[in-house]
Amino acid sequence: MSNMVEVPIFIAILSFIVMCIGELLAYYSVSLKYKYEFEAISFGFIFGVATLILIPKSYSNMFVLYVILGMITVYLIEKYLAYCPLSKKYCVECDNLEENRIKFIYPISFFIHTFIDGLIIAVSYISEIGLPLYLAILMHKLPAGFVLISPLKGVYKNPLYPGVFVSFGTVLGTIVGLVTLKDVSTKILLAFSGGVFLGAFLMLAPHIYEHKEEKTFLYILLGYILVGIIALH
């Protein structure tokens, strides 16, 4: 493995570690005081990466089709595979059906999310985008780990075991992406990734307003501006 290939692997491992730290904080009930502000900045960053870097660099014949496919992929995952008990006013006294969904469906849907993060890291390396995409993944890992473990504490004796497995999806996705995507057109990868990021922003950013309406737009704008500054260099 060349030194260059080691970079995305390092980013994937770092993402795994950061997410595990978020899980530990949730496990020991350490509050993330600015969790929603940080998430808002990361969503703005994701939106900026999609609209200022990925989609413009993917311009080619039929690139819009792949952007739309990326957005549809996110929509289908959110609609049919994703499950978040926190959005359903989760409590430890849920009935057995709800408990089983939290115990099994929730971590599986989260694993899909982390695996896709890994694929995006691989795309960042293959397409030579580098830093902006790496940061977009890293920035939301701490709150993601916190959100993952919070409901699992009510259904697992030790929720860190499934948490670590879910977090490892980023490393696994990166390895799979580096092996399987290297011969795919860079333009297609960039367009599809741009669609994924744009879809993720449109699906997830509104949830921030449910928890933190105050100054949310400003935090999203800050994340977007950060990408603009990076894109100029």
Swiss-Prot record:
Organism superkingdom: Archaea
Name this polypeptide is given: Uncharacterized protein MJ1036
InterPro entries referenced in this protein's UniProt entry, alphabetically: ZIP (IPR003689)
Chain segments annotated as transmembrane: 7-27, 36-56, 62-82, 119-139, 159-179, 188-208
GO CC terms: membrane; plasma membrane
Organism: Methanocaldococcus jannaschii (strain ATCC 43067 / DSM 2661 / JAL-1 / JCM 10045 / NBRC 100440) (Methanococcus jannaschii)
Membrane topology summary: Multi-pass membrane protein
GO biological process: one example: zinc ion transmembrane transport
Keywords from the named record: Cell membrane, Membrane, Transmembrane, Transmembrane helix
Compartments where located: Cell membrane
Main location per the UniProt record: membrane
Pfam family, one: Zip
GO molecular function: zinc ion transmembrane transporter activity
